[in-house]
Every structure is written in C-alpha cells, then in structure tokens.
Amino acid sequence: MEYAMKSLSLLYPKSLSRHVSVRTSVVTQQLLSEPSPKAPRARPCRVSTADRSVRKGIMAYSLEDLLLKVRDTLMLADKPFFLVLEEDGTTVETEEYFQALAGDTVFMVLQKGQKWQPPSEQGTRHPLSLSHKPAKKIDVARVTFDLYKLNPQDFIGCLNVKATFYDTYSLSYDLHCCGAKRIMKEAFRWALFSMQATGHVLLGTSCYLQQLLDATEEGQPPKGKASSLIPTCLKILQ
C-alpha cells in the first residue's frame, strides 16, 4: 500500500515539475561550471638595443607578435635580428620559454655581428665621459609639463604644470582647455566674417573706380553718375 502511494505521489504534477526543475538547474550549473577557454592576453614587454641606449615598451600576445612589433618599432624591416635576455644573454627562441618568463623581463635586440655584453663592460668603454659627471647633483628648480585629455574628443586637453624647488617645495597648477575647440570656432567665424566684409568693400570700391574711369574716358562729368553708383554697388554686394 505504501509503495502504491509513493508511486502515485511521483506521478503527481507538483512533484513531477519539482523533479524537472531540479534536474534543469543541475544541468544549468554543470554548463556554467565548465571551464571556458581563456582568451590570450597581451603582456607588457620591454625591449632594448644592444648598447642599452634605447628602451621601448611593447604589448605582445606571443613571441611572434613581439618580433613583428619590434621590427616595426625599431625599423628593422630588412635586417635580421633575434631576442635575448638583457640580464644574462639567453636566447629566446621558443614560445613556451617566452610564456614562462616573468612579466618584468627585459629583452635585448641583437643584429648581425652584435654580441651580448654585461652592463659593466659597456660602462668601461667611456671612462672619460663618466669622470666628468658630478658625484652628487642637487636640483634647484625643476618644472614639468603634463598634457593630457579627459575626453578623447577634446581639441587640446588639459595642461598640468608642476614646479619643484630644492626637491622640497612643489607647486602645481591645472589648466583646463576643454573649451578651446569652441573658442577656435568662434575665432574662425569672426575671421571669416571679417574677410567677407573686406571682400565686399574691395569689390564695391573696384566697381566705383571702374565706372568712374569709364565715365572719364567717355568725356562725361563723373558727378552725374555718382548718384547711380551706390545702388549698383549694393546690387553687386547682395
């Protein structure tokens, strides 16, 4: 009897809908919990030349992408080169080794005939230039200018001026030029109006002088036609 009641309860619509909803939620959770393939992310890379005089920051997805961007950035289109680690000169040849490197790794570009050298050996090549540098330098005043935009559509943007005295006192000022585009439009509008007015004046003057010369050549007194010149010039200006 109890078994029959349990069977009837399973066929009851409420219990049936409950089982269906629970099963649907389980399937949904399984679908959502499945790991999705991660999209490749660009990693920041720092690249220097063989003499360490030029450093560039490049965002690359892979080793091949880094090589292409290094060729374009350093203008090495027709020059063979390869990448090594700046700290020890290890050649970077495989994608697995590139992905295993840390994010702050610095790469060095070596062209044909160039060899990796530690920074100490490069520093001994110019002992005279290093000897002229003072041991300690004290900045009396330093002024920095930072031009940035709050909106990509800004014409000029904002200018931040910062002055530092004796590395102790600092003063900064922000100059917002967001409305510079509107000011330039008004200036251009007034300049256009001035040029149009000047053109009308010159055109009216030339018309008056032309009719004056025609009247003089025909032997008629210019005063007789002076009254009719103004309406003619006004018609031309319109």
Swiss-Prot record:
Annotated keywords: Activator, Apoptosis, Endoplasmic reticulum, Lipid droplet, Lipid transport, Nucleus, Transcription, Transcription regulation, Transport, Ubl conjugation
A single cellular component GO annotation: cytosol
Pfam families for this protein: CIDE-N
GO BP: apoptotic process; execution phase of apoptosis; lipid droplet fusion; lipid droplet organization; lipid storage; negative regulation of lipid catabolic process; negative regulation of triglyceride metabolic process; regulation of apoptotic process
Ranges in a coiled coil: none
Record carries keyword Protein transport: no
Family under the similarity heading: Belongs to the CIDE family.
Protein name per UniProt: Lipid transferase CIDEC
Species of provenance: Homo sapiens
Lineage, broadest ranks: Eukaryota, Metazoa, Chordata, Craniata, Vertebrata
